[in-house]
Amino acid sequence: IRSDLSEKVLAVGNSEYETTYTIVPTIMTVYRGYAWADIQIGITPVRFVTTHLESLWDENEIPNAAKQARQLIADLKDTKNPIVIMGDFNSDPRDPRIKDDPNAGGQPTASAACPGGTSVCNAYLLMREAGFKDVGPNALDPINNTWGMNALLTGPDPDRLKYSQQ
């Protein structure tokens, strides 16, 4: 934060998710977590949270991103101030993909552990069910992707502020 605004920072913190992903057992484990800051905006303190949920997943298992989203929701449940969460959720509203659905990105696929069309294995839907609002335009419309070539070619979404104020 800019030095002239440092007095607006009320508190900061971070946490590590309990769920990790081990690529090479005992040698390489991927740890993820989140950082937060309570910042005075006008007369209201607002908690800003940034995170990067796990992208890797194992077939017929609940993706770590969903487990991490559950922990994030639980960790924030007693926060009294407004909350803004941002980051890379590595989740798509269509996950887990039903067999034969387009899945060019290798997203989680439906299985006994992860039924399609539910939030059981979907970090995005878990956050929505917990009451968080997606301030971007329709996440199912590929034109609104905020990653990949579309974002690189077209730049930031000019309508994001408008959607957040609705």
Language model region names:
Residues I1-L53:
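Structured beta-strand-rich core segments of catalytic domains in phosphoester-bond hydrolases
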Residues N60-Q166:
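Metal-dependent phosphoesterases centered on the DNase I-like endonuclease/exonuclease/phosphatase
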Residues L53-S55, N90:
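Short, glycine/serine-rich, charged loops/turns that create anion-binding
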Residues V24, S55-I62:
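Second-shell loop/turn segments in exported
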